[in-house]
């Protein structure tokens, strides 16, 4: 499951064993609402899990408008398609033919996605989401100026 914020290009993704309405509801609650607040709208494919009474009520109760992309024209949800492609390509590069480990590599691929500037904006999704650049592990080990200013 992948969710993308259209403005910041921030992506949340999780390896779900099932994609039932209750699983999607749990994903939206854990990965979006509790971290970033209630979304104004949600654009999804017209899968049954997004169109179920359970998920519709969940969205209605939170004031989220549930919208659908056109099933025959996937480009109508182009941001999600581009993000899916970036995540799949990142997983392919990290796994190099090894199958079955993609769920363990997903957080690493997301980290790379969040901290890489997007061409369309010239900024990272991380900086647009949190208002500053991420401190990367190399900065800590080399004690960069940004890190040394905050050493207690």
Model-inferred region functions:
Residues 1-152:
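Integrase module of LTR retroelements
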């Amino acid at each position: 499951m992948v969710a993308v914020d259209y403005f910041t290009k921030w992506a949340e993704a999780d390896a779900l064993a099932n994609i039932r309405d209750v699983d999607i509801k749990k994903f939206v609650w854990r990965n979006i609402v509790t971290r970033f607040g209630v979304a104004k709208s949600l654009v999804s494919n017209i899968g049954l899990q997004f169109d179920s009474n359970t998920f519709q009520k969940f969205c209605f109760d939170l004031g989220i408008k549930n919208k659908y992309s056109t099933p025959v024209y996937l480009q109508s949800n182009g941001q999600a398609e581009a993000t899916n492609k970036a995540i799949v390509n990142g997983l392919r590069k990290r796994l190099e033919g090894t199958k079955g480990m993609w769920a363990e590599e997903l957080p690493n691929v997301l980290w790379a996605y969040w901290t890489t500037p997007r061409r369309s904006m010239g900024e990272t999704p991380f900086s647009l989401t949190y208002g500053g650049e991420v401190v990367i592990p190399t900065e800590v080990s080399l004690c960069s100026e940004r890190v040394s200013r905050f050493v207690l």
